[in-house]
Amino acid sequence: MEIRTATMADLPAIAQLEAVCFPAAEAATEASFARRLEAYPNHFWVLINGETIVSFVNGLVTNEPDLQDDMYDNAALHDENGAWQMIFGVDTHPDYRRQGCAGKLLEHVIRQAKAQGRKGLVLTCKDKLVPYYAKFGFLSEGISQSTHGDVIWYQMRLTL
């Protein structure tokens, strides 16, 4: 399996994988992914098995220290020189879960953020995933201000 940055040609497969991984109220749309790919293609990574995208991670870079709901759909908030790498989604196809795919991608993104001199990475997750992200050094900051999808999210931060 290999990691590379996503391209517009990947858009249909990315949108399809998102629909498999998240309920409609939480899932990003294909149009939102297109805006993200246009604005920050170097911050959208896919894990490929042969020709198949099995996992992806994406998110903008900003000087804002906390992940905010408007960041998901407003790609113009990306600041390539920003201090914080936001992580909007860690999607892995169900057939590839519990095989280290998401971890491989997260480790890659963390290395990229270090190499780019970021202060760290921020993501939000459901409570059941807090221990998973803690394995990578993320610390829980408690319940996020996010109301995305009418779900309770926990903000996690990895300071580099």
Predicted ranges, named:
Residues 106, 111-125:
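Conserved GNAT acetyl-CoA-binding A-motif
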Residues 24-50, 58-77:
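Active-site rim helix/loop that mediates acceptor-substrate recognition in acyltransferases
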Residues 61-64, 124, 134, 139-155:
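Conserved catalytic-core motifs of GNAT/GCN5-like acyltransferases
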Residues 96-108:
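Conserved acetyl-CoA pyrophosphate-binding loop and the N-cap/start of the following alpha-helix
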Residues 6, 90-92:
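Hydrophobic adenine-recognition pocket in adenosine-nucleotide-binding enzymes
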Residues 1-14:
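A short beta-loop-alpha structural element at the N-terminal edge
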Residues 56-90, 97, 147-153:
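Conserved acyl-donor/pantetheine-binding loop and adjacent beta-alpha core of acyl/acetyltransferases
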Residues 93, 126:
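Residue-level recognition of the GNAT/N-acetyltransferase active site
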